Amino acid sequence: MVQRDARPPFAAIGGAVSPEFAALPTPCYLLDEAALTRNAEILGNLSRRTGCRVLLAQKAFRNYDLYPLLAPHLAGTEASGLFEARLGAEEMPSKEVHVFCAAYRADEMEELLQYADHIVFNSPAQLAKFGPAAKAAGKSVGLRINPECSTQDGHAIYDPCAPGSRLGTTRAQWDAAVAADPALPALLDGLHFHTLCEQDADALAVTLDAVADKFGDLLSKMQWLNFGGGHHITRPGYNMTTLERCIRRAHQDWGVTVYLEPGEACALNAGYLLTRVLDVVQNGDTTIAILDTSAACHMPDVIEMPYRPPLLGAGEPGEKACTVRLAGPTCLAGDVIGDYSFDAVPAVGDLLVFGDMAIYTTCKNNTFNGMPLPAIYARRPDGTTREITTFGYSNFKHRVGK
């Protein structure tokens, strides 16, 4: 029943289910090696053209078995804390490890200094508290800034520049901190901003203007400037020309090395979630297919963002003959993936394939309601598959006890 689908999430598989898919267990994440490599090559070519340094933001994708595909094209990894920093150091050895956290724990700092090369602090207070030790350990020290420039519509949960944001230091906060402690500027090697979410380079250009206006005098004294993440660099149609102009502007105006730390761009359209239909029920005019996967457990951003993930061969509601609501088997009434249309109602046992499932899935999933974690497989460039890991009852049990 699945027809050829030319949309970007499915282009790598020719827009159709291959025989290898049918043999895989469900639910199952299938990570596409060729698509990951293609994304990494785009990022690597950007680095070569502009001199910028690109990091993998592990918060979006940390399937380290596939790091060897990414590492040749990247400068290293970005971490949000101790565990991600350690993972980056272990799985991309000899590469840079950068870390940013809204607040660091004192009892973790000594170990963190073993793994991180760059440490970015969120506030002047944290910079004053931990910056001297980081400098003494030979680390490059940065401060996350808040340029107070929102470029997002409808995603306040992902807007670090929203009023009352806890993320980043405003210029007023910095000036007040320096007035109280004039030694703070000497601790800094670079500045970091992260204000985008799944955006094009025009939003970056607007943000960079704000950064220049509020922090330009500081940047001339810095070694590096980190543009953060949220850049959809590998998305078809992304404005690479504007991105490169922003990078070159930072080089020319302030003499800094530019870092980018995309997460989604590294693994965009490079994964699938395979699932089968368990039951089909009718409630009034609504046809509901209950799947062996769960939005709440296996693709939590569907509910958190929220958004409706692409589904191979399916149309928008009303586009095809039969509109069906796809939902999970948990007790959560809102465990709904979305409404899709098909030529015919999916039958029990039918295989469905969701696209763009490499990002914010395996790193965020959970076992609510006792839902098993999906197996993780990789798809080789020749179309064959290999098992990366599987999960069972012990994984569920041991998260809450010994």
Regions found by a protein language model. Name each.
Residues 149-151, 197, 233, 266, ...:
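Feature marks short, surface-exposed loop/turn motifs that line or immediately flank catalytic pockets
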Residues 205-210, 239-246, 275, 341:
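Charged helix-capping and loop-helix junction motifs
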Residues 251:
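Active-site neighborhood of glycoside hydrolase catalytic domains
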